Amino acid sequence: MPTMNQLVRKGRESKRRTKRTRALNKCPQKQGVCLRVSTRSPKKPNSALRKIAKVRLTNRNEIIAYIPGEGHNLQEHSVVMVRGGRVQDLPGVKYHCIRGVKDLQGIPGRRRGRSKYGTKKPKDYI
C-alpha cells in the first residue's frame, strides 16, 4: 500500500483498455480480399452453420469476418468491405462483411431491414 506522499509523487496508472476492432486501424470500414469462405458451428445452446470468410485487409491483417443474411455469392479472391461488430455465438469472429458493397451482393427480394442487407427499395413498395 503506497503512502500519500508516494501517490502525490507518482500517482496511479490507469489500466489500458484493448480495442475490440484493432485490425481496422481506427477506421470505420476496411476493404479486403477473401482468402477462404467456409462455415462454422456456434457455441453451446445454439445450432447452425454460420457462414464466415477469412479476409486479408489492405493493411495486410488477416481476420475472420461473418457473412450476414441468407445466401451469399462470395468465393475466394472476392473483394469485400468489412466493419466491426462481433458475432455473439462465434468465438474469435469480431467483424462483419457489409452486404451490397464491392463483390458481396445484397439479398434480393428482402423487404424489411433492407439497409442492413444492401437491398434496394422495390418498385411496388408502399
Curated annotation (Swiss-Prot):
Keyword Mitochondrion recorded: yes
InterPro entries: NA-bd_OB-fold, Ribosomal_uS12, Ribosomal_uS12_bac
Coiled coil: none
Biased composition (Basic residues): 12-23, 109-120
Transmembrane segments: none
Matches recorded under PROSITE patterns: RIBOSOMAL_S12
GO cellular component: mitochondrion; small ribosomal subunit
Intracellular or extracellular location(s): Mitochondrion
GO biological process: translation
Main location: mitochondrion
Entry superkingdom: Eukaryota
One MF annotation (Gene Ontology) recorded for this entry: structural constituent of ribosome
Keywords associated with the record: Mitochondrion, Ribonucleoprotein, Ribosomal protein
Keyword rRNA processing: no
Region (Disordered): 1-27, 106-126
Family, similarity comment: Belongs to the universal ribosomal protein uS12 family.
Function: Protein S12 is involved in the translation initiation step.
Protein's name in the database: Small ribosomal subunit protein uS12m
Annotated organism of origin: Marchantia polymorpha (Common liverwort)
